UniProtKB/Swiss-Prot annotation:
Note: Some HIV-2 isolates have been described that can infect cells independently of CD4, using CXCR4 as primary receptor. These isolates may have an exposed coreceptor binding site.
Locus of motif YXXV motif: 698-701
Organism: Human immunodeficiency virus type 2 subtype A (isolate Ghana-1)
Positions of region (V5): 454-460
Region of interest (Fusion peptide), ranges: 503-523
V2 as annotated region, ranges: 153-196
Pfam families: GP120, GP41
Site, Cleavage: residue positions: 502-503
Annotated protein name in UniProt: Envelope glycoprotein gp160
Disulfide bridge map: 43-56, 100-205, 107-196, 112-153, 218-248, 228-240, 296-329, 381-438, 388-411
Lineage per the UniProt record: Viruses, Riboviria, Pararnavirae, Artverviricota, Revtraviricetes
Region V4: start-end pairs: 388-411
Sequence ranges of Acidic residues compositional bias: 725-738
Gene coding for it: env
Length: 738
């Protein structure tokens, strides 16, 4: 008896546990959760008058940053923001300079001879070691800038007259042609244009300027940008604890140069180094206290001579000049002090494992055999490509004895340029006529750190893309995923719709991210306001993008921004519709907290509502999302079936429905069906009974009787009874009187 009682009690307890302790999936909309993303960004700028920024969104500096109490991983090299910057700047650069005509006709044999009175690049050591604004060299050609060795070539091609060959004269730098050593005739060598058979070469159609463009990147609606705000961030940080969120990056300027970065926006009153997480690539931000700058100048005049190769094809050449090396660059500022601080900062870097003696840390040039863009400092000055030999400058910075030291570098302008982002070569027009000058602020150094046992070399690099690792490497693009799952004991939820107060304070799109560092319980209490903030921000960003698209309908093909802006808007709409469609498929449309009937899949996995953030919880349940989503969809399908059946029953609950005309027509229809059914049933029953009687030998009642003779019974006379009075009474009823 006692055992049965215990069993009953245990059963009751188990039932109560299943009823009250079972947890169900609850859908939350508006939670501060995100994932890494790689969608196209769009641009914003203040100056929309230039061709490169006319399609950008107007910049109003209204980009507040919100501090997040979270920890995130940042990597300047594995970063979609920096990759997009490199691709976009390259597209703008290529569109601006416009190389377009293939020069395969120049891959012909040429008869060349060297010009006279040529000197080597750095053979002259005369002149002042340092110059400034008041020096004569600043306004004229600097003494000591050697002449570039050039060659004068002749070749024959079919010109406008197809049946005749015409002789052409062309001047090349000696490094732009390759000559056969054992093939000389009359003191002339047989030469070809260098690299003509190894790359696709194009020539510029017209002369264009490459002006720097200032812009910032902005995330589409539904996305955001996180930034590591840690001063010790060095380009790779798996756990950055000082994170801020924004919709746009800082303002940046397009840069295209090797060795140095010009006019960057990351310069501070300190020197810091971004170091690649897996190799020796670095980008060094220079201290702006030292006022480092570069001033480049091309004195004198130049003339351009067009050469008609054939109908519709013109190659632009320049005549032999007594001073082919046309440019030089002067470095201003406290360069020696700045370079010394770079060495000291390198020693303190956590990844540095070399010598601690700054005397054994040297700035060096790349090795021989490198491309010209690597061996020389390459930059663009007013549309002209300068190649500067930095030997004198490095000797001056390092104060190397017995070496030629100058704070300026000799430069020359080239026509054949190696593309800095893709493999290939472009041929541009010779320099435009007149004097050219350009001034820039030096803000960074691109270098590789080569560490030996007792010596460290800081070798200058030609990785132009590294400039954008420094500019945008502390950002990362995220996709806001405001839909979250968590287990609760509530099986279903129903309440009257709550009316929103008019005075709700909206922080903007990033307002709900401010609760990312809060506990899950605290963040869940404000989901209504957060979801309204999220939707309001998305609508606001979409409206801004729509304004841009309306103004750029006729200029979508000019720059890369037109396509990216349209793609950003489409991405935003797709994301919003995807979230709403997903909520609707679960039966949770327009609800901030949606309780379901789906049991929680893992009872051992439960959130800590008081101490765990939504981002931390999301990382734990991410592998369950597919199963949860499928279960929610199946439950919603079953719920819709149940609702359909219930709606069919609900039509009989309302008393007024009984008096509906359409209902009465149905009732009459049903009555006719019933009467006809009863008649048919009676006929069927009668036929069955008739058949059963026939089988037993009975005739139907309604059948005609066969002919027969009626028998009349004749009774014999009996004597008259004595008592006649009683005879009448006693006679047989069956008798007949005759």
């Amino acid at each position: 008896m006692c055992g049965k009682s215990l069993l009953c009690v245990a059963s009751l307890l188990a039932s109560a546990y299943l009823v009250y302790c079972t947890q169900y999936v609850t859908v939350f909309y508006g939670v501060p959760v995100w994932r890494n993303a790689s969608i196209p960004l769009f641009c914003a700028t203040k100056n929309r008058d230039t061709w490169g920024t006319i399609q950008c969104k107007p910049d109003n500096d209204d980009y507040q940053e919100i501090t997040l109490n979270v920890t995130e991983a940042f990597d300047a090299w594995d970063n979609t923001v920096t990759e997009q910057a490199v691709e976009d700047v390259w597209s703008l650069f290529e569109t601006s300079i416009k190389p377009c005509v293939k020069l395969t006709p120049l891959c012909v044999a040429m008869s060349c001879n060297s010009t006279t009175n040529n000197t080597t690049t750095t053979g002259s050591t005369t002149g002042m070691s340092e110059i400034n604004e008041t020096s004569p060299s600043y306004s004229d050609n600097c003494t000591g800038l050697g002449k570039e060795e050039i060659v004068n070539c002749q070749f024959y091609m079919t010109g406008l007259e197809r049946d005749k060959k015409k002789q052409y004269n062309e001047t090349w730098y000696s490094k732009d042609v390759v000559c056969e050593s054992n093939n000389t005739k009359d003191g002339k060598n047989r030469c070809y244009m260098n690299h003509c058979n190894t790359s696709v070469i194009t020539e510029s159609c017209d002369k264009h300027y490459w002006d720097a463009i200032k812009f910032r990147y902005c995330a589409p609606p539904g996305y955001a940008l996180l930034r590591c705000n840690d001063t010790n961030y060095s380009g790779f940080e798996p756990k950055c604890s000082k994170v801020v969120a924004s919709t746009c990056t800082r303002m940046m300027e397009t840069q295209t140069s090797t060795w140095f970065g010009f006019n960057g926006t990351r310069a501070e009153n300190r020197t810091y180094i971004y170091w690649h997480g897996r190799d020796n690539r670095t980008i060094i931000s220079l201290n702006k206290y030292y006022n480092l700058s570069i001033h480049c100048k091309r004195p004198g005049n130049k003339t351009v001579v067009p050469i008609t190769l054939m109908s519709g094809l013109v190659f632009h050449s320049q005549p032999i000049n007594t001073r082919p090396r046309q440019a030089w660059c002067w470095f201003k500022g406290k360069w020696r002090e700045a370079m010394q601080e770079v060495k000291q900062t390198l020693i303190k870097h956590p990844r540095y494992k070399g010598t601690n003696d700054t005397k054994n840390i040297n700035f060096t040039k790349p090795g021989r055999g490198s491309d010209p863009e690597v061996a020389y400092m390459w930059t663009n000055c007013r549309g002209e490509f300068l190649y500067c030999n930095m030997t004198w400058f490095l000797n001056w910075v390092e104060n190397r004895p017995n070496q030629t030291q100058h704070n300026y570098a000799p430069c020359h302008i080239r026509q054949i340029i190696n593309t800095w982002h893709k493999v290939g070569k472009n041929v541009y027009l010779p320099p435009r006529e007149g004097q050219l000058t350009c001034n820039s602020t030096v803000t960074s150094i691109i270098a590789n750190i080569d560490v030996n046992s007792n010596q460290t070399n800081i070798t200058f690099s030609a990785e132009v893309a590294e400039l954008y690792r420094l500019e945008l490497g502390d950002y990362k693009l995220i996709e806001v995923t405001p839909i979250g799952f968590a287990p609760t004991r509530e099986k279903r939820y129903s309440s009257a719709p709550v009316r929103n107060k008019r005075g709700v304070f909206v922080l903007g799109f990033l307002g709900f991210l401010a609760t990312a560092g809060s506990a899950m319980g605290a963040a869940s209490l404000t989901l209504s306001a957060q979801s309204r903030t999220l939707l309001a921000g998305i609508v606001q960003q979409q409206q801004q993008l729509l304004d841009v698209v309306k103004r750029q309908q006729e200029m979508l093909r000019l720059t890369v921004w037109g396509t990216k802006n349209l793609q950003a808007r489409v991405t935003a709409i797709e994301k919003y519709l995807k979230d709403q469609a997903q909520l609707n498929s679960w039966g949770c449309a327009f609800r901030q907290v949606c309780h379901t009937t789906v049991p929680w899949v893992n009872d051992s996995l439960s959130p800590d509502w008081n101490n765990m953030t939504w981002q931390e919880w999301e990382k734990q349940v991410r592998y369950l999302e597919a199963n949860i989503s499928q279960s929610l969809e199946q439950a919603q399908i079953q719920q819709e079936k149940n609702m359909y059946e219930l709606q069919k029953l609900n039509s009989w609950d309302v008393f007024g429905n009984w008096f509906d005309l359409t209902s009465w027509i149905k009732y009459i229809q049903y009555g006719v069906y019933i009467v006809v059914g009863v008649i048919v049933l009676r006929i069927a029953i009668y036929i069955v009974q008739l058949l059963s009687r026939l089988r037993k030998g009975y005739r139907p009642v309604f059948s005609s009787p066969p002919g027969y003779l009626q028998q009349i019974h004749i009774h014999t006379d009996r004597g008259q009874p004595a008592n006649e009075g009683t005879e009448e009474d006693d006679r047989d009823d069956d008798g007949y009187d005759l």
